[in-house]
Each structure stands twice: as structure tokens, then as C-alpha cells.
Amino acid sequence: MTSRPRFRDLLSLVALAIAAVVPATISAAPPPGIPDGWSDGFVYANGIRLHYYHGSPATGKPVIVMVHGVTDNGLCWARLTWKLQDQYDIYMLDTRGHGLTDPFTSTDNGDTLIKDVVDFVRAMKFEKPILMGHSMGGATVIRIGAEYPDLAKAIVVLDAGIGGMGGGRGPAAAPGGPAGAATPAATPPAAPPRSDNMPFAMSGNPETLAAQNNYKFDDLVAKGRRQNPKWDIVDIQYWALSKQQYHGAYNDETFRNVMQGSMRTADALAKIPVPMIILKADAPPEQRKAHLEAAKAMQKGKLVHIDGAAHNLHHDNLPRTVEVLHEFFSTL
């Protein structure tokens, strides 16, 4: 005679079934690592330890050094690098105060981020690399082109302000509110933030920025998906990771004097002697006209608007971005 299973046995079976299923459904996904075939490293430059990523090695091919924007990291270039790395040897910097690079110091000023990149190029012994920058990184490479005219072979700028500081930007890459609603300073939330309520400050006291680093990766990814429906999941994941790593500007003075200070490009466009291209986000006719007028100052350059793309145009419209870059590179 077969006995019926006891109630306690049934509970045990149910518990085992739940244990087998629940970890797969509620466990947090880990942040992504370095893409296959890539490497990373550190170099001492301009008084700090700079961290960089290196795409699949392309020895003997032209070098590109990529410089990201505020609150991002070097991996935010991943998908664009995949499209270019067969023809170019690509290095992606973590800017000071970002990613795994050392933080800002009390002696930094508006020239510091520019000198970081210049000293990185020299420390790595690159001969006339192509310099590419997005947003704040775009302003950085503009200034390098003007202030160190013999350093680069060409300058590539993705949606940086031109002719001054900032301006002309579409949505940025911060996770507070609509993409780009990050504020110079904010107060840490009293309760653990939900993925739809995650304020993010570009500067502030250390406690504020450290609290942001504790945002859950899955929550950042969920917010990134909602804010940026055009982005590939790879872009969103590295964007989320960069927000967990951001450790820049522990006071508003550093943000103004160093980060914003690096973006004061003024009349730099007219001083750049090497070939240059500026990719701008989509914009209304009057703004496009103003951009093209400012671009006339370039000696050997042009400006192209990327239709349908906002500030992070290499995420919003990667195919068109790559097409424009290949056309430009073919002229070098």
C-alpha cells in the first residue's frame, strides 16, 4: 500500500522548487566586463594614474584616442569602437574623476583635463593619433587641437559646444529625469531610490556622489531603457556602469573651474591646423544654421548634423555616425 505524501514533505518540495526559480528571477545582474579581445591598463600622466581601455589590438594601424563626456567612462565608446577597430588601434580613456581613473585634486584647473590627454598621448608614445571626443571630451580635443597643434593627425568632435562653453546640446547621459537632467548638486534620497526616481548630481559633497554609486545596476539599466529607447542594450549597460563609477567634482568649485573650465573653447576652432569634423545632434533649422555659421571658423573642417539623434548621437544613430566617420577618415 502506497502512503500519501505528508504535508511536511509537500512543503519541502515546494520550497525546493521556489529556490530553483527565484534566484534566476530576482538576483541582480552583474555589470558587464571588458569586451572579449579587449584589454585595459593604467599610465601615470599629468600627476595621476589614468585608466584606459584598448580595443582589439591593431598593431601598425592608425591610433584613435577617445575621450568621453561628463559622468561616462571609456566603455561608453564600445559599440562605436567595434565598428572601427578593424581599421584603427583604439584607446578609450577614463577621464579624471570618472571610471577607474584617479579623482580630481585641489590644484586642478580648466587646463587639467586637456593636459591629461596630452600627457597620455606622450606617455604612450603615440605619433599623431586621431583624437575623438564626445561632449566635454569633444571640447577637450578641440582645445588640444588649438593649443597643441602638432600633437594630433585629426580632430573628431561629437556634439560638443562650439565657440564657447557648452550650448547646443541635446539630452545628456545622466540618469536623473529625462536624459540630461543631471544637476550640478543634489541631496541624497532619504529612502532607497526606485528606478523611476534616481536623482543624479554631477557635483556635490562626497556623501552625495557616493550614494549615487550605490544605485543598483538593474535599476540604472531599467531607467536607461526608458529614457533612451533608441539605444542598444550594450550602450545602456555601460552607461549604467559609468554612473556607478563616477567620482568627479566633490564640490561645485571643481565642477565649475575644472570640468566646465575645460569646455571654454572660445575661438579655438580657428586655430586648429589639422583636418577636423564636428558631428552635431539633430536640431531645428535655426540652430543648424547657427552651428554651420560657427563651423566656418575651421581651417580644414566641416560640420555634419546626425538626423534623428540627440546628444549621444553615437548611441542614437550609430550607422549614420559610422558612415560619416568613414567618409572623413578616407580623406586623411
Regions found by a protein language model. Name each.
Residues 46-48, 53, 95-132, 136, ...:
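Active-site loop/oxyanion-hole signature of alpha/beta-hydrolase fold enzymes
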Residues 301-332:
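Catalytic active-site module of serine/aspartate enzymes centered on a nucleophile-bearing elbow/loop
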Residues 54-100:
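Conserved HGGG/HGGXW glycine-rich cap/lid loop of the alpha/beta-hydrolase fold
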